[in-house]
Regions:
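S-adenosylmethionine
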Residues: 1-401
Length: 401
């Protein structure tokens, strides 16, 4: 999504606050750090807010500006590029995106959006920012019009996603579900909190429920970080071995288990999930909540859509197959393996299940969950427009005994 060039590490230093434009100054600085330094939005913004003296109301406004502009960056670029005669430096590009987002996607009065955004750029750039944003304000896009009649040029631009994501989802979900799913993931994420205070999406909570582990069961969570599912399983009374391949992420599981008072029920192991160091048949349930493209949970990370590449999907699909193949021997006869991913792509869901049907015809698919889950071959899928949750796919198999 990057346009233009320029020095990295722009606008460093502690943020000085106190003027009416402070919120937009913080937002612009955050957008520059995300764009130029390739910083992660969910790390950059909280650190900057902590280093500011903004009010709670202004912090909420900055959060909406930064995450919203990041999500809708492609759409904002198209809105302003209609009226730009030349490429501009990164700070001006970021300010134009910021202004266009307020004009097109927020209920900010046009005069306020334009004047306050103009005020945060250097004096030499204020003329072009003012002129372009006024043109954007005067020429709103008709969402129902075609490309030749004042409408958006295409679906990917209107919804602000890379072409490949839209193309793949159209092929896998069809037009209506794709538009609804991508639109839902442009909305801010809903916070779901368990009764123990742990924040966990409802789709993830339902994966744990469908694992159906209870007191006396021995459960392996093969890709456990940050520990949401492992701790939920432990709360149900099971003994959990939580594995992760990276020591830092495994430490997150330990910290979360300790915070919830579950350290006695969750044993954390640093282990490569494709070569797990456990005895065959040693678990009643194995959960493979595999690394995936995350195309069902894009609302959680405003910049995720711009970071994932199409090439990564095939690499992740291969890893997912290796993880499931490594996990199957660990399930005792009569036990259950659950495979889950927060993606909507057939390559990471249906294709894997089809391979398992050929390689392991002995596996018995278990009953599908009810709505809002939808049938997905021998498994089920929840779309992100269903109930405010992430998109998720789930397959459950019993190992014959």
């Amino acid at each position: 999504m990057a346009k233009g060039g320029g020095p990295r590490n722009a606008r460093r230093g502690r943020l000085q606050v106190g003027s009416p434009t402070d919120a937009r100054r913080v937002a612009l600085d955050a957008l520059l750090r995300i764009e130029l330094d390739r910083g992660y939005a969910n790390l950059v913004l909280p650190a900057m807010l902590a280093d500011s003296a903004l009010s709670d109301r202004d912090r909420a406004f900055v959060t909406e500006l930064v995450y919203g502009t990041t999500r809708m960056g492609r759409a904002c670029d198209w809105l302003v590029d209609r009226f730009l005669l030349r490429e501009v430096e990164p700070e001006v590009r970021a300010a134009l995106r910021l202004g266009a987002y307020q004009l097109a996607f927020l209920r900010v009065p046009s005069h306020a959006a334009v004047s306050a955004t103009v005020a945060v750029v250097p004096p030499r750039s204020r003329g072009v920012v003012n002129a372009v944003l006024r043109r954007v304000s005067e020429h709103p896009v008709d969402p129902d019009a075609g490309p030749d009649s004042g409408g958006w040029p295409d679906l990917a631009t209107r919804l602000s996603y890379p072409d490949w994501i839209v193309r793949r989802l159209l092929a896998d979900l069809g037009h209506d579900d794709t538009v609804a799913a991508l639109g839902a993931m442009n909305e801010p994420a809903v916070v779901h909190e368990r009764d123990d205070g742990y924040v966990q999406d409802t789709a993830s909570q339902q994966v744990v429920e469908l694992l159906a582990a209870g007191p006396g069961d021995r459960v392996l969570d093969l890709c456990a970080a940050p520990g949401g599912k492992a701790t939920a399983v432990a709360r149900a009374g099971a003994t959990v071995v939580a594995a992760d391949s990276r020591r830092r992420r495994a430490r997150l599981v330990s910290e979360n288990a300790a915070r919830l008072g579950l350290e006695g029920s969750v044993a954390v192991v640093v282990a490569d999930g494709t070569r797990p160091p456990f005895a065959a048949g040693s678990f009643d349930h194995v959960l493979v909540d595999a690394p995936c493209s995350g195309l069902g949970s894009l609302r959680r990370r405003a910049d995720a859509r711009w970071r994932i590449s199409e090439d990564a999907v095939e690499r992740l699909a291969r890893l997912q197959r290796h993880l499931v193949e490594a996990a199957l021997p660990l399930v005792r006869p009569g036990g259950v393996l659950v495979y889950s991913v927060c993606t909507l792509l057939d390559a990471e869901t249906l294709a894997l299940d089809a391979d398992l049907a050929v390689a392991h015809p002995e596996l018995v698919p278990l009953d599908l969950p009810d709505e809002p889950w939808q049938p997905l071959g021998r498994g089920a899928r929840m779309l992100p427009q269903s109930d405010g949750s992430d998109g998720m796919a789930l397959f459950r198999y019993r190992v014959p005994g």
